[in-house]
Regions:
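Active-site mouth loops of central-metabolism enzymes
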Residues: 1-9, 60-74, 120-125
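Single conserved hydrophobic/aromatic residue that forms the stacking wall/gate
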Residues: 126-135
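Hydrophobic faces of well-ordered beta-strands that scaffold small-molecule active sites
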Residues: 4-6, 25-27, 54-58, 90-92, ...
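Active-site-adjacent beta->alpha loops and helix N-cap segments on the catalytic face
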Residues: 32-50, 96-111, 129
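Conserved, mostly hydrophobic/aromatic
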Residues: 17, 82, 121
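Glycine-enriched alpha-helix->loop->beta-strand junction motifs that scaffold or abut catalytic
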Residues: 20-25, 50-52, 86-89, 113-116, ...
Length: 135
C-alpha cells in the first residue's frame, strides 16, 4: 500500500496537500532550515479543519542533531503539548558527535511519544556517520 505524506508548515499548505491527494501530513515550522518543532495552536487548526493524520517534526533548532539534556527535556515537553493538541505521531532524530544514532536520546524521545507512531527524521539519516564538532 502506497502512502503519500506531504511536509507542510502552514494551514494553507496543509489544505493544498489534502487537495493534492495527501494521505498524511508531516507538520513542522521553518522548512527553510530543514524544519523545526511546530506550534500547537496551528496543529489544532489543521486537525479541526482537515481529516488527515498528522505527524509532527520534533527539532528544537536548526543545525545538527546533537541535543543537550536541556534540549531533550524541551522536546519531551513539546511532544506532550503536541500530543494533547492532536498529533497522531512524531518525526524524531538524535545523533552522537561520532555521527551514530544517539540511542539513549532516542529512547528518551520514544518514551515521550507514549506509543504514538514514530518516523526517523530524514535529515538525521543524512548526518549519520558524519562526525560533528560542537562549536
Amino acid at each position: 500500500m502506497k502512502l503519500l505524506e506531504v511536509c507542510v508548515d502552514s494551514l494553507a499548505s496543509a489544505r493544498a496537500a489534502k487537495q493534492g491527494g495527501a494521505d498524511r501530513l508531516e507538520f513542522c515550522s521553518a522548512l527553510a532550515v530543514g524544519g523545526l518543532t511546530p506550534y500547537a495552536d496551528l496543529l489544532r487548526q489543521i486537525k479541526a479543519e482537515l481529516d488527515l493524520p498528522v505527524r509532527c517534526l520534533m527539532r528544537p533548532r536548526a543545525g545538527d542533531f546533537l541535543y543537550t539534556r536541556d534540549e531533550l527535556e524541551l522536546l519531551c515537553r513539546q511532544i506532550e503539548t503536541l500530543r494533547s493538541a492532536g498529533a497522531d505521531g512524531f518525526v524524531i532524530g538524535a545523533l552522537t558527535s561520532e555521527g551514530a544514532l544517539d540511542l539513549p536520546a532516542m529512547r528518551t524521545l520514544l518514551d515521550a511519544c507514549g506509543g504514538a507512531p514514530v518516523t526517523l527524521h530524514r535529515l538525521s539519516l543524512i548526518h549519520i556517520s558524519e562526525p560533528t564538532r560542537r562549536t
